[in-house]
Amino acid sequence: MRVLILDHDGVVCLSNNWGSRLKKQKKWGGRKMSMTLREVPVEHRFDNFDKKAVKVLNEVLTETGAEIVVSSDWKLHGSLEDMGVYYDLMGVVKKPLDFTPIVDQSGTLELLRSLEIQQWLDNNKNVTSWVSVDDLDMSLFLWCI
C-alpha cells in the first residue's frame, strides 16, 4: 500500500485560510464557551483547504493510488469519520484512511511528529512506499524513521 502522510496547516490549509473556521463559526451562530471544538458541526470546525493545494493533492492521489494518513494536529478535533466528511466538503478525492497516533512524550513538534509517523509505520507493515508532506522541518529526526 502506498501512503501519503499529510499535515494540514501550511500544506493544504495555507496561511490565507487560517482563521476561516472562526468566520464560519460566527456565521453558524457562534461557538459557545462551554462547547468543545468536537461539538461544532464539521463544516464549521476547521479552516478551509486551499483550492490549488486540493487540486495538486487530488492529482497526486489519483496518479499514485496512495491512501491518506493524517498527521496534522487537526486529528485532535474530530474523528476519522468527521475528517472524511470534511475532506468531501473540501473536494478531496479520497477520505483519510487513518490518523497517526498521539505520542505521549515531551519534545519539539518536529520530534513528536516524526515519532508519530514512525509508530504508525511500525504498526502498518503493509506499507510498500510512503511520503510525508509537512511544513515542519523534520530532517533532524530522520534517524527516527
Can you name each region flagged by the protein language model?
Residues 1-2, 64-66, 126-129:
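Short coil/turn segments at beta-strand junctions that form active-site/ligand-binding loops
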Residues 6, 71-77, 133-135:
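Short His-Asn-centered micro-motif
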Residues 43-47, 73, 107:
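Short, charged/polar micro-motifs that form catalytic or ligand-binding hotspots
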Residues 1-63:
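Active-site neighborhood of HAD-like aspartate-dependent phosphohydrolases
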Residues 64-83:
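Substrate-recognition element of Asp-dependent hydrolases with the DxDx(T/V) motif
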Residues 11-12, 19, 75-77, 136-139:
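Short, solvent-exposed loop/turn segments at secondary-structure junctions
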Residues 81-145:
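C-terminal cap/substrate-recognition subdomain and adjoining C-terminal extension
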